[in-house]
Amino acid sequence: MLASASRERPGYTAGVAAPDLLDPKSAAQNSKPRLSFSSKPTVLASRVESDSAINVMKWKTVSTIFLVVVLYLIIGATVFKALEQPQEISQRTTIVIQKQTFIAQHACVNSTELDELIQQIVAAINAGIIPLGNSSNQVSHWDLGSSFFFAGTVITTIGFGNISPRTEGGKIFCIIYALLGIPLFGFLLAGVGDQLGTIFGKGIAKVEDTFIKWNVSQTKIRIISTIIFILFGCVLFVALPAVIFKHIEGWSALDAIYFVVITLTTIGFGDYVAGGSDIEYLDFYKPVVWFWILVGLAYFAAVLSMIGDWLRVISKKTKEEVGEFRAHAAEWTANVTAEFKETRRRLSVEIYDKFQRATSVKRKLSAELAGNHNQELTPCRRTLSVNHLTSEREVLPPLLKAESIYLNGLTPHCAGEDIAVIENMK
């Protein structure tokens, strides 16, 4: 079907291809340009080609996106370097000065022993141990609540990095546990995201029904409902948890919001971790934090899914509109070309007709002038113009009379002819 359609209507979807109006045959048969506009343009590309174009990204597009990402990384690296490197240099200088001051004030401690102590402290911090105070007020990072929270960070792929397995058995079990737990959590996240999407969808439907009663356009309703959905989710999963973390952990408002966003986007730097401070927590605090992470990730997944659906719809509509625009553009181009050719043909015909009429008039006038000239200027009826100087006039013979015509400066044999003489004196 598509092949036959493309053979019948190549180029564009007009009913009849625009004829070449400068061609004598077509010009004779088509006195006017044949314009045709189809109400529903047909996209000539096959469905298989369009599907493959949608499903498979071209290398040119991939290369362009790759260059954009690299440029984005370079910009980010430049900004982070400008913001963070001066602070790093300042802290390094401060530590060196403090070490020198400590060694100067404590002669019994040499620099080698102090460096060994610092290395042990750094290793303890990397292991998740805060070497402050004595052993009586130290909180274990591997109690049941902390272990539950760590297992949750494994299967959610957040991986804060503040604690990690140190034994060989723990590392082996973590590998197997992650390979099995991550897909399982993916199914759970999808299910929770669908349920949240359904709940929010019902709420959005009620909001849309309310706006429909107020005669608000569908586009504005969709925009308003989307903004409400995003704002409600941000308040429930970002603002409210940030306030709770600020109060419990003793963080600033910026640090609390920073932790929430870094966690729910699964970045998980580990510089701020809920339940990681050296304070007394409730036993159910860390499990509750993990359930908040679960629901928050599901919300973000629902938002991303909704955005993806919108982008697909917009992309589909855009492709259809582009196809229709191309079809109309091709048809318009053909029609304009046909009209231009017809205009040029008409101008050529008019110019040719005027030229022919001018030529005919010229020939007619030339024929008439030639006839009058032959009739008037016969050998017996000539008009002679004789120019004389004053001195020459005196030398010339007197006028000869031939009937009523006088000759001046002519030979005598012309006296018998009817010749008109005009004397121009200089």
Swiss-Prot record:
K(+) 1 binds at T157, I158, T266, I267. Activated by various stimuli including intracellular acidic pH, mechanical stretch and polyunsaturated fatty acids such as arachidonic acid. Activated by volatile general anesthetics such as chloroform, diethyl ether, halothane and isoflurane. Activated by arylsulfonamide ML335 and thiophene-carboxamide ML402 compounds. Inhibited by extracellular acidification. Inhibited by antidepressant metabolite fluoxetine (Prozac). Inhibited by barium. Not sensitive to polycationic dye ruthenium red. The keyword Calcium does not apply. Residues 157-162 are annotated as: Selectivity filter 1. The record marks H141 as: pH sensor. Residues 1-36 are annotated as: Disordered. GO terms for cellular component: apical plasma membrane; astrocyte projection; calyx of Held; cell surface; dendrite; neuronal cell body; node of Ranvier; plasma membrane. Residues 27-36 have a biased composition (Polar residues). GO terms for biological process: cardiac ventricle development; cellular response to arachidonate; cellular response to hypoxia; chemical synaptic transmission, postsynaptic; chloride transmembrane transport; cochlea development; detection of mechanical stimulus involved in sensory perception of touch; G protein-coupled receptor signaling pathway. Residues 266-271 are annotated as: Selectivity filter 2. Glycans are attached at N110, N134. It is a multi-pass membrane protein. Keywords: Cell membrane, Cell projection, Disulfide bond, Glycoprotein, Ion channel, Ion transport, Membrane, Metal-binding, Phosphoprotein, Postsynaptic cell membrane, Potassium, Potassium channel, Potassium transport, Synapse, Transmembrane, Transmembrane helix, Transport. K(+) 3 binds at G159, F160, G268, F269. One of its GO terms (molecular function) is identical protein binding. Belongs to the two pore domain potassium channel (TC 1.A.1.8) family. This is Potassium channel subfamily K member 2. The gene is Kcnk2.
